[in-house]
Swiss-Prot record:
InterPro entries: Huwentoxin-1. Residues 1-19 form the signal peptide. Expressed by the venom gland. SUPFAM superfamilies: omega toxin-like. The lineage of its organism: Eukaryota, Metazoa, Ecdysozoa, Arthropoda, Chelicerata. GO terms for cellular component: extracellular region. This is U7-theraphotoxin-Hhn1h.
């Protein structure tokens, strides 16, 4: 009887340790994934500042990308980047 109780307690202890390790690993993966997402967002924001993409608002200080042109649309103060019927060279 004592052996059975000892085995059950030992098994519970092993499961607790494994569970704690799995939870720590899961948190580390979650943090790594979050950092990766933030890095990707920062990279895309840097790209977006270089030029405005299709249907993006444009002004003199916010130029459109090479294959787009800034055109007047719907309002005097609202210009957007539209396609200039060319393709970017790779």
């Amino acid at each position: 009887m004592k052996t059975a109780i000892f085995t059950v307690v030992l098994a519970l202890a092993v499961f607790a340790v494994l569970s704690f390790g799995w939870e720590a690993n899961e948190k580390a993966l979650s943090e790594e994934f979050t950092e990766l997402i933030h890095e990707k967002e920062a990279a895309s924001e840097t790209e977006a500042r270089e030029c405005r993409y299709f249907w993006g608002e444009c002004h003199d200080h916010m130029p459109c990308c090479d294959w787009l042109v800034c055109r007047y649309k719907w309002s005097i103060t609202y210009n957007i980047c539209v396609w200039n019927r060319t393709f970017p060279e790779k």
